[in-house]
Amino acid sequence: MLLQLLFVLVAIIIGARLGGIGLGVLGGLGLAVLTFVFGLEPTSPPIDVMLMIVAVIAAASCMQAAGGLDLMVKWAEKLLRKNPSKITLLSPLVTYIFTFIAGTGHVAYSVLPVIAEVATETKIRPERPLGIAVIASQQAITASPISAATVALLSMLSGYHISLMDILMISVPCTLIGVLAGAFCSLHVGKELAEDPEYLRRIANGEFTSDQYRTKGVENHRAALLSVVIFITATIGIVLFGSMTELRPWFSLPDGSSRQMQMAHIIEILMLSAAALILLVTRTDGIKAVQGSVFSASMQAVVAIFGIAWMGDTFIGGNMEELKGSIEHIVTEMPWLFGLALFVMSILLFSQAATIRAMLPLGIALGISPYMLIALFPAVNGYFFIPNYPTVVAAINFDRTGTTHIGKYVLNHSFMMPGLVATGVSVALGLLMIQLF
């Protein structure tokens, strides 16, 4: 088993270094080694999870193509420019809401330069709002009803009669309070901008310009607004179907019994329908949807789940008895330790959904309560730990003052403190909630 684990970890590390779809395809190579060299039987690939994510990507990409994302950024810019002194508290709420609505953290790219510029103009150290804004976009993944991670968790806990509302009632308040805690801790990070040596050096060397960043205009305001309304309506529909099971239709089977429509199918149908309506109502070119940043970045996550999660699932399935025998008694006594395992795995996989898909079968097999697993859900937000995730790199590049940085020892970077605070508070509150309620 240890040799198999070594191959799995090597595949993950090399895949992460390759970037893009590298993580997913290396997972496929690792799966080939597990199957043909070690003789493990492949488990079923996560088809339902992947199809749900593809449907959400289709809708979000169409909204972006219709100008909906640009319109949301305009709204965010107006809010931040009207309240510049509160930017450290408002910017994480903006990126949290963006991600909560769209289901992907990649929408944060569009608002990060606005945050950086408003902070600079107000003479607030940009590191403070940027650091927690990036973390908020990650935390919201585990609160969004249509994110790949939430969809994967819901799919895998369906056998326990867990509804979407059961997940959201814990994950939304916990992650939101965690983000606010991180924001308050960020209020006094580092020196004031006027005293920062890197900022002063850039001014002295003429590297800092006073050019203002402005978001691009919305070409067709009506089409953009319609796309946002259609997308949000579909999201609300998913929440309603997920929380009120009586709304889901029943179908008669040939043997006389009946079966209720699966939540996976509802998500797929509503999101594909939303995508179609956006294209039809706004007369947006479908080709434009696949050329946007949301489609490209999110499809990489699908490939990652396909390869990495399938490889991880096969490894865990093939070694389940040995794994249970070695760690079951520890996890039974201290189930929160499974949260630490989720955190570490998310650092390696750079994906909340892939982490859930790879690790949750082990948690279920170890007998961990489904509500405990929901409470530990925010622990999969650990990929800020190593500062090479695209949104982290983007935030550093957008900060012209140089205050948002990676430290000399790599791990002492601008996102470590807000990330640990937000994740720690979210998980702690989740554990408290399941004990009280």
State the predicted function of each range:
Residues 10, 14-16, 26-35, 40-124, ...:
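Membrane-embedded alpha-helical segments and adjacent helix-loop junctions characteristic
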Residues 1-60, 197-313, 417-437:
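Hydrophobic transmembrane alpha-helices of multi-pass small-molecule transporters
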